[in-house]
Amino acid sequence: MPLVVRFPDVLKNRLETLQSAFDMAINSQGYEAHYQGVYPVKCNQDRFVVEDIVKFGSPYRFGLEAGSKPELLLAMNCLSKGSADALLVCNGFKDTEYISLALVARKLLLNSVIVLEQEEELDLVIDISRKMSVRPVIGLRAKLRTKHSGHFGSTSGEKGKFGLTTTQILRVVKKLDESGMLDCLQLLHFHIGSQIPTTELLADGVGEATQIYSELVRLGAGMKFIDIGGGLGIDYDGSKSSNSDVSVCYSIEEYASAVVQAVLYVCDRKGGKHPVICSESGRAIVSHHSILIFEAVSASTSHVSTQPSSGGLQSLVETLNEDARADYRNLSAAAVRGEYDTCLIYSDQLKQRCVEQFKDGSLDIEQLAAVDSICDWVSKAIGVADPVRTYHVNLSVFTSIPDFWGFSQLFPIVPIHRLDEKPTMRGILSDLTCDSDGKVDKFIGGESSLPLHEIGSGDGGRYYLGMFLGGAYEEALGGLHNLFGGPSVVRVMQSDSPHSFA
């Protein structure tokens, strides 16, 4: 433990669902081109995951997207076993080696497209392609004005990290024309941001991009593809809300329909040929296919304070200073009157004054503990004691759930056994690392604790929990914090018979 359980059949289903949604939208709206997606390797670069996507996507011309030289090498190797028409979209910062590799891919009959993220990359592409005697296929990333305001929207808009402005796009077109390579410009790429919250925002961005696409056609580019990037969101918390970074208010079918409709509207109005629609929907494809299983090895116990005896209580009160004795008298009076909020105020004041006495040496540790017991007993007596326990779980949050630590990304976490028993406790999760940030204390639905079972009352004292929808990015981002090592991995696939698994 911890253990990552992967279900390639779920991966296949997600890919087929995405393809089916676009096929349905294309057929129902009379769109005159097709959809073919690409999987961004950065979402989960595990070899088996990438190979499964290429295998399952081969009938649909499904390709890969790379953002670095190592990712490009992995993608080239995997796509050599895929569809000949699959796209190999080459994004990211590009130096001489990167561009040379992308051109080698074309020599190997892979359908690589070099997407310009910076204007300076064009000179390298022209120069290297001539030296290698390879006719490149070029795309460019447009920096749209459309953006969304959530956490994931920072890469979009005019001040986004990537892409070319309209002025830069025109300069690229002019230079390609002067070089006799304008026909090589075949793809327009853009990215509004991950977790696009609404189809209205999506349609706005796709419409703007299609206008740019149509202008490139008018200027003589050999345009064929419009790559709408990522952004197909996951409803992590089940709220179907447009006001949350962990939810979206649309289905895959509604997403596909909005994209096709937006492209169709602009192209028909301009009288242009419909482009092949491409998307880079990594999160939507791989999030569901794996489960992180981990064990709660222990839990903090709830200490039940007993009511002190009257004699012991009187002896303790006599050792307190005058201010602390006043707090105790006020606490007692408020409890008799049933003023529970006032009780808490005087209880906190009493504890703080006694801490000060302990610091100056006038109160010993036994007396300080007795005061704590009095205050705890009062809290329990009036029903405001904190019932939340800390469950110590055998993992590192930094390694296995880095997005929670980094920006409080929420994931569904539930017990995965003893489901016929009603949970009787509430708890937060604390990992086994030596860092105070290694805990999970925010959960789906705005909860600050989870309903959990008592440890040790079944299954040999073992207690297992599962985290879901973590198939994208968590494994890719996790390191070896505290040298804990990575989780073990198990692949579960349905075999020939309906209820048999391997």
UniProtKB/Swiss-Prot annotation:
The modification N6-(pyridoxal phosphate)lysine is found at K42. Pfam families: Orn_Arg_deC_N. It is an enzyme of class 4 (lyase). It comes from the Eukaryota. It catalyses: L-arginine + H(+) = agmatine + CO2. Its cofactor is pyridoxal 5'-phosphate; Mg(2+). Its EC number is 4.1.1.19. Substrate binds at I226, D227, I228, G229, G230, G231, L232, G233, I234, D235, Y236. InterPro entries: Ala_racemase/Decarboxylase_C, Arg_decrbxlase, De-COase2_CS, De-COase2_N, De-COase2_pyr-phos_BS, Orn/DAP/Arg_de-COase, PLP-binding_barrel. Keywords: Decarboxylase, Lyase, Magnesium, Putrescine biosynthesis, Pyridoxal phosphate, Spermidine biosynthesis. The keyword Oxidoreductase does not apply. This is Arginine decarboxylase. It comes from Solanum lycopersicum.
